[in-house]
Amino acid sequence: VADKIDWYLANPLTRRERRLGRSPSAWARSFACEDVSVLIVCRGPIRMEAMDVLDEMGVARYGILLSDKDSIVYQQARAPELRRMDAARVHRVRDYSGATTAERAERVADIVAICKAHGYGYVFAGYGFMAESADFVAALEDAGLRFIGPCSHTQRAAGSKDEAKRTALAQGVS
């Protein structure tokens, strides 16, 4: 009987060495990111996927952010990402974005404070309301943090369709 092959694990397009620091190429090693520290600010499957990618890339220092609502729900759901996390890397905020402008500013300040207190230099927000907020990204940039995604200037320029079209044309991508 021939051995069964797990095509997902054997697929070189999805399963390959992603730790660039181990590459024989000096050029590839220059892109190594094992020394970055990331706070993941998104939910569910996207958070789990980000954790998997960071693990594959050799990023050992990352934490996740939970809202109070997530903290209650996830204790009942036994989310897989929480089962494998050191509790010191799970951080909480009241909610992710707040209902008012003042609450949003307070939440962003909470996220910045968590990053500073725990040594996270990067923030990954997946996609959606936080990842697409130029104000959120600008606040991170102003605090000396790096956002994994488009910078606030790009987000603002792309925020309006006609400005996005002009930006794309100016960059030669449309």
Label every PLM stretch briefly.
Residues V1-S174:
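N-terminal beta-alpha lobe that positions the nucleotide/phosphoryl donor
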